[in-house]
Regions:
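Interfacial helix-cap and linker-helix signal at transmembrane-aqueous boundaries
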Residues: 32-33, 64-65, 152-157, 236-237, ...
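Structural signature of the two symmetry-related core transmembrane helices
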Residues: 72-86, 275-289
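Residue-level signature of mid-helix packing/kink "hotspots" within the transmembrane helices
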Residues: 23, 51-59, 144, 254-262, ...
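Extracytoplasmic gate region of multi-pass secondary transporters
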Residues: 25-26, 210-258
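Juxtamembrane intracellular "pre-TM" segments in multi-pass secondary transporters
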Residues: 1, 185-214
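Cytoplasmic helix-loop-helix junction between adjacent transmembrane helices
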Residues: 100-139
């Protein structure tokens, strides 16, 4: 195995673990709501503080990596996330859970910008978009496997033991990844600080309007995804679902999402970025609205198709970021891009939780599905710049 593939494999392993941590929350939220007597707003706040912690640390992580290297930060962040979930397994109140999830989210904030930077550097002269697509797919594998495994384990060993077991696995991965990256000399060397005419606050963005356009679609896309996934389990419970069935439902969504990232990436090569984004966003909004009216079994049947559209847009957007940012500021650029997206993911569950408390989960999800269509005029507005970025 050559160095580039080894770096990609390491980044994929980290992505698998962190997305597993992030998305077991969708299984645990209904369990916590029942055990701690939570309102929908409180449920949304749990998701919000985790994603908010991720968002808060992504730009600092990109800056700090320039001083200490990606490898150390990735290992430390993975360990911090795992320890946050270990602590969650011992929590006995809503406030304790909030604290644990904030800590876990902060640790997970290093993963996206630094792993993406490592992969981009390893494939600087190679098939970077394909490598980043593979990296994104590994996260979807974590989304498919880990929530399903935890959902199956909860009725047998309880949610605390299930969470602690996966957290122990995360700690082991943190150690292994650090050793592997050091062996590969990836993210270890810290470039000497050479002051030039460039300001230290220069983010290296080549095309500000193009970057803003990508980020705006990312914000809407991510808020749709997190809002939908947070309250999908409650919609399914209202239709008669069990905890185990929720795990299967999430697995279906994430499996569709994994396919969607590959399928939509290929579709973008054939149809272009603009047309692909329009197709995926229209399909996402339409499928969410249809889902509300279906009984449980038909709802489960359409979830993989919904997953394809729900995750498909991201594969089109991520590969373009590196084209809009200079190579020496790439960790910063990814940090900004992911911060905006994760920030939207953080805010959406709490907002839709308030809507759910006021008017019910179906109303909140109807709003989620409708807001997706706001991407259409935005996409048409930036047609020329996105087309140039994708060229």
């Amino acid at each position: 195995m050559n160095r580039a593939r080894a770096v990609l494999g390491s980044a994929c392993g980290i992505h698998f673990v962190h997305d597993g941590f992030s998305d077991i929350l969708y299984v645990l939220l209904p369990v916590w709501a029942r055990e701690f007597g939570l309102s929908f707003a409180e449920v949304g706040l749990l998701r919000t503080v985790y994603s908010g912690g991720m968002a808060a640390f992504q730009i600092p992580a990109g800056l700090l990596a320039e001083r200490v290297g990606e490898a150390r930060l990735l290992a430390a962040g993975t360990a911090a996330t795992a320890l946050g979930f270990v602590a969650a397994g011992f929590s006995g109140s809503f406030l304790a859970l909030l604290g644990c999830l904030i800590a876990g989210g902060l640790g997970s904030g290093v993963q996206h910008p630094l792993s993406s930077s490592l992969v981009s550097e390893a494939y600087e002269t190679g098939r970077r978009r394909v490598a980043l697509g593979t990296y994104n797919f590994s996260g979807d594998l974590g989304k498919v496997v880990v929530p399903a495994a935890v959902a199956l384990a909860v009725p047998w060993v309880g949610w605390r033991r299930a969470v602690e077991t996966y957290a122990a696995f995360g700690l082991a991965v943190a150690v292994v990844i650090l050793l592997v990256l050091y062996r590969l000399r990836a993210g270890v060397e810290v470039a000497p600080r050479i002051e030039t005419s460039r300001s230290s606050m220069d983010w290296g963005i080549r095309d500000a309007r193009g970057f803003q356009a990508l980020a705006a679609i990312q914000v809407i896309d991510n808020s749709t995804r997190s809002g939908f996934l947070t309250f999908l389990p409650f919609l399914l419970i209202a239709k008669g679902s069990t905890v185990q069935a929720i795990g299967i439902a999430l697995m279906l969504v994430f499996a569709g999402g994994a396919v969607g990232k590959f399928l939509c990436g290929a579709l973008a090569e054939r149809l272009g970025v603009i047309r692909t984004v329009i197709i995926t966003e229209v399909a996402t909004g339409g499928a969410i609205l249809v889902l509300l009216a279906l009984p449980l079994v038909p709802a489960l049947v359409i979830l993989p198709v919904l997953g394809v559209a729900l995750n498909g847009t991201s594969s089109v957007l991520y590969g373009t970021v590196a084209d809009l940012v200079t190579s020496d500021r790439r960790a910063r650029g990814y940090g900004i891009f992911y911060t905006l997206g994760v920030g939207a993911s953080a805010l959406a569950p709490f907002v839709y939780g308030l809507v759910s408390d006021w008017g019910g989960v179906p109303l909140a999800l109807g709003l989620v599905g409708s807001i997706v269509f706001l991407t259409l005029p935005l996409t048409l507005l930036i047609r020329r710049r996105l087309a140039e970025a994708a060229a």
